[in-house]
Amino acid sequence: MKESINILAIESSCDETSAAVVINGREVLSNIIASQISTHEKFGGVVPEVASRKHIEVISAVVQEALDEANFTLDDIDAIGVTYGPGLVGALLVGLQYAKGLAFATGKPLIGVNHIEGHISANFIEYKDLKPPFMCLVVSGGHTFIVYMKDYGEFEVLGETRDDAAGEAFDKVARAIGLGYPGGPKIDKISKEGNEEAIKFPRANFHDDTLDFSFSGIKSAVLNYLNKKEMKGEEINRADVAASFQKSVVDVLVDNTIKACMSKKVDKIAVAGGVAANSCLRETLVRECKKKGIEVLIPPFILCTDNAAMIGSAAYFEYIKGRRTSLDINAVPNLKLGER
């Protein structure tokens, strides 16, 4: 095998169009991201059809910019990695079809990547010496998982949400208290002005041995609290609501992840996904893990949000295991972690 494996990666699962050039799964030469946040902000959330159209408008330019920034041409690329699920089906198809076209035209192998595996692999970019096994908490707008990474490309899901993802709950609560979209960063910001002990919202876990989560209950509790306040004509302290809600979510994320770590006897927790940028989650996880002698690994914000560099990293580890993807592959919007 060549000393350096160069992956061109494409990500379009939701509202970011991204392309990157990644060497050997850990070195990023370029990571171009065209965000649609301003486009969807006025709608209060991502509109799937609008997202797909925006991907179509910019994908060619984004891929070319990624190659140019890396000072590469397609001749320098060994394989093309692309997200094929989970995500919005229309958005996924834009990136997938573009990648398939490139693979067909150049004769380069295609490697389909699970978006969640991509989030986990973002840690290999930031932490060059990181190797499995370790625990990973994946928290984003559409996904919440506690994952035991046994080996490269080998996962065991120990806990997951049974309804809303953590990021989805953040967005819905932010909308309810008039903060707008995207909810996660706005709740994080206003929470710093609030009292996290002001309101006792329920914790988002189950009273059994499972490490699963349920965020629909806490979301409903917040909405009920707001409705009662409005019916009584009482003032609503948005900062207190945001801080109390955030604490109830973060506490169960941290507690369950530490329990998972102890059960598998691993001393590293890697965090992935957009909600990993939340300052309360970061601070609480680091503080509580320090008490248990567990190291916490959190990539920078650019690698926590959806980006193609993480897809390039995951594609590399698939490539060296000899895995290739047929050009007949289709988008799988509900793809499960570990499925191929």
Curated annotation (Swiss-Prot):
Catalytic reaction list: L-threonylcarbamoyladenylate + adenosine(37) in tRNA = N(6)-L-threonylcarbamoyladenosine(37) in tRNA + AMP + H(+)
Main subcellular location of this protein, as a coarse class: cytoplasm
Entry GO CC: cytoplasm
The keyword Repressor is annotated on this UniProt entry: no
GO MF terms, alphabetically ordered: iron ion binding; N(6)-L-threonylcarbamoyladenine synthase activity
Top-level division of the source organism's lineage: Bacteria
Database matches in CDD domains: ASKHA_NBD_TsaD_bac
Localization: Cytoplasm
Residues reported in the UniProt entry to bind Fe cation: 115, 119, 306
This enzyme's EC code(s): 2.3.1.234
Required co-factors: Fe(2+)
Function (record text): Required for the formation of a threonylcarbamoyl group on adenosine at position 37 (t(6)A37) in tRNAs that read codons beginning with adenine. Is involved in the transfer of the threonylcarbamoyl moiety of threonylcarbamoyl-AMP (TC-AMP) to the N6 group of A37, together with TsaE and TsaB. TsaD likely plays a direct catalytic role in this reaction.
Family of the protein in this entry: Belongs to the KAE1 / TsaD family.
Protein name: tRNA N6-adenosine threonylcarbamoyltransferase
